Amino acid sequence: MRKNESSLTSLISAFARAYHSRYDTPLIFDDFIAKDLINEKEFIDISKNMIQEISFFNKEIAERLQNDPEKILKWVAQIQLSPTPLARASYCEKVLHNELILGAKQYVILGAGLDTFCFRHPELENSLQVFEVDHPATQQLKKNKLKDANLTIPGHLHFVPMDFTKTFSYDPLLDEGFKNTKTFFSLLGVSYYVTREENASLISNLFSHVPPGSSIVFDYADETLFTAKGTSNRVEHMVKMAAASGEPMKSCFTYQEIEHLLESSGLLIYEHLSPDDINDLFFSNRKDNLSAFETIHYIHAVKK
């Protein structure tokens, strides 16, 4: 991401969560705060943009639904935009709540974007410290949006501005009160935008300052990322959209490569969800177009 730009992917992800909360049923993940961070003008502008791009996504759907923009938007949201942000957030927060029961005291959200966890769970203010780590421009955008939405930043939420994929340092976290205690990390929608070497370095650095039992949930793209088409060519479209937005996808892994990367930093895979697993867990028995995204896997790994 360029220095003075906030992340387009954060806006699109928040839009997808807001759209799902408003218009889909049953809900995979209810981010009822996201709509407050995407103002009405942004919601309309992003909606219009997606509707206008329907020919890029699917020419047949563009023709069939040419007189029904709302159905076009629903198709784009459910096929292209929403599946991964919804399911990975649902999975991550389920794991987090289990980790809290097991004694985690800190939650570090890497690439937090417009995450709303703290605002949806005020009951955790006295038991969990939350550190949002992201590019300074993205954090400033979020702070502005929180102010516009009249949302007060809770006392347990700490903003840590850092371009962490390039140079990770614990110093800014320590300055915000981070302690050497059991910690849960999330790294969602990030791994495929950085190189293999940057992923390995980041994981190694993250777990150098936390005790055994600390863990991480992240998603990664498998080795078919740059060759798979997916439903309605959506995998190919995802790769092209990322490149066009200035945040190209850079890495993909086999399961064995991810396992080796984690083992090198002293982590064991506790749970791995393949696209089929994700589909069974989060998208079964639906009557709409939502389904797990091909090529994207979820991992929960724990420090030995």
Curated annotation (Swiss-Prot):
Asked if Methyltransferase is a keyword of the record, the answer is yes
Q: Residues that bind S-adenosyl-L-methionine, according to the entry? A: 134, 163-164
Which SUPFAM superfamilies does the record associate with it?
A: S-adenosyl-L-methionine-dependent methyltransferases
Offer an example of a GO molecular function term for this protein. methyltransferase activity
EC class? transferase
Alphabetical list of InterPro entries matching this protein: Ppm1/Ppm2/Tcmp, SAM-dependent_MTases_sf, SAM_mthyl_Trfase_ML2640-like
Q: Give the protein's function.
A: May be involved in polyketide synthesis.
Per the record, the similarity remark reads: Belongs to the UPF0677 family.
According to UniProt, the name of this protein is: Putative S-adenosyl-L-methionine-dependent methyltransferase YktD
Q: Which organism is it from?
A: Bacillus subtilis (strain 168)
